[in-house]
Regions:
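Transmembrane alpha-helices and immediately adjacent membrane-cytoplasm interface residues
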Residues: 1-21
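A structural signal for short, hydrophobic/glycine-enriched beta-strand patches
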Residues: 17-172
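A transmembrane-helix-recognition feature enriched in membrane-embedded lipid enzymes
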Residues: 167-186
């Protein structure tokens, strides 16, 4: 019974440590005048962005309006229930919001966060350019961790809000994803 208690206590300590790490990214604002931002894809409903993707896109739009030299890499392939790629959906949304097509690069093969970051590298000098990653707030810490593991040198997170009542669910799920990532070989 003592071993069970020790294991449970260790598990709780690890869980709270991971949640603390995730919490460090919840309000990440990035820095001004980044060379690139990578907007991580998220579910598309038909041809329209999901609520989570719309939050990411609104954050990207605001950043790009405030930083007119920044280029966006829109990263996301086409899921099974999606009529178009996530990248194409993002392009349409941002163009409609007034962002010039010349500032938008589409990466349309990725289906995971790791692939988003790996496949987006080809569009920039990821070891020297200053790069921001836009994703929902609960996902920022792990995304930046993955970027650094993928060789990005000058990278920061930019948190899109998550106003969903499911935020606590996402935070718990992200803790398990982060634990899995920390066990994954680089």
């Amino acid at each position: 019974i003592a071993i069970v208690r020790v294991c449970l206590l260790a598990g709780l300590i690890l869980f709270f440590y991971l949640e603390h790490q995730i919490g460090t990214g919840l309000k990440a604002e990035g820095v001004e005048n980044l060379d690139y931002i990578i907007v991580l894809g998220c579910q598309v409903k038909g041809t329209k962005p999901s609520k989570a993707l719309k939050d990411r896109l609104d954050t990207a739009k605001e950043y790009m309006q405030a930083n007119p030299e920044t280029i966006a890499v829109l990263s996301g392939g086409q899921g099974k229930m999606e009529e178009i790629s996530e990248a194409e959906c993002m392009r349409r949304y941002l163009e409609k919001a007034g962002i010039s097509r010349e500032r938008l690069i589409l990466e349309q093969r990725s289906t995971t966060t790791r692939q988003n970051l790996r496949y987006s590298r080809r569009y920039m000098d990821y070891q020297h350019d200053e790069i921001g990653i836009i994703t929902n707030n609960f996902h920022v810490y792990r995304s930046v961790l993955l970027a650094r593991r993928s060789g990005y040198q000058r990278v920061c997170g930019i948190a899109a809000p998550c106003k969903s009542v499911l935020l606590y669910h996402y935070l718990v799920r992200e803790a398990f994803a982060l634990a899995r990532e920390m066990l994954h070989k680089r």
